[in-house]
C-alpha cells in the first residue's frame, strides 16, 4: 500500500529577497516538519525578519518557492494567513483596551464566527492563564502578561503554525518561563508547529527540536542542538555554535529594511486605533 506523504509545515525552496542592491535572504532552502519547534537563529541583519515576513505572507516572495502546509504562498495567501498565528517583535496590544477586547479584535480580524467568538476568546485567554485578568486594561499588565496576551491573540484562530519573533525579549527569566510553559502546553494539546526567532541561545537549546542558523542571508547550518554542538567541539554550547557560524566576516548591524519595519508599525497602530473606537 502506498503511503501518502504529508506536506511540510514550511517548505522553502531557493528563497531570495533583495532590498535594492542588498540581499537579505540568499537562495535559502529549508523544511520544517509538522508539529516540531524550529529555532531560527542569527545575528542582527542576518535576514531572519525578512524570512519571517515571507513565511507569514506579509512580504511577497520575490524569487524561489514557498509552501505552507502544501499551499503555494503566491496563490493561497488568504488560506495561509488563516492558518498562521503570528507574534511580531513590535508590541501589538492596545493598552487602552482590556485583555479580552484585544483578543476579540483579533478574533474579528481572523474571521472567527460571531457565535463562536466569545468562547474562542475565553479559551485563548485561559490557555495563557489570563482569564482572571481579562477585563483589566492591557496597559496595567506586566511585561510577561503582555507577551502572553499577544500569544493569546495569535491562538484565537487555532492556527496550525505559530510564528514567534523574539517573543521573550526584555523579559526576566521567570516571565520568560511563564510564556514558554503556556506555549508548550498549547503545542502539546493541539499539535501546532512553532517557528521561533530568539537571541537567547539557552532558550533555543532547551525548547527547539531543531535550529537553523542564518548569517548574511545564507542558511549556514540546520540540525538538532546536540548535532550542531557536536560538530563544533566536545562540550560546546549553542552559543559556541552561534559564534562559530556567525562571528567571521560580520558586516555590522545593517537593518534589513527600515521602511518595512516602520510601515508595519504604522499599520499596527492604525488597526489598534480603529479597535479602540470600535470598542
Model-based region annotation:
Residues 104, 108, 115-133:
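Conserved ABC ATPase "signature" region
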Residues 222-223:
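ABC ATPase "signature
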Residues 177-190:
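Helical segment within the ABC ATPase nucleotide-binding domain
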Residues 158:
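Conserved catalytic motifs of ABC-family nucleotide-binding domains
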Residues 137-141:
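Conserved ABC ATPase signature
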Residues 162-165:
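Catalytic Walker B motif of ABC-type/P-loop ATPase nucleotide-binding domains
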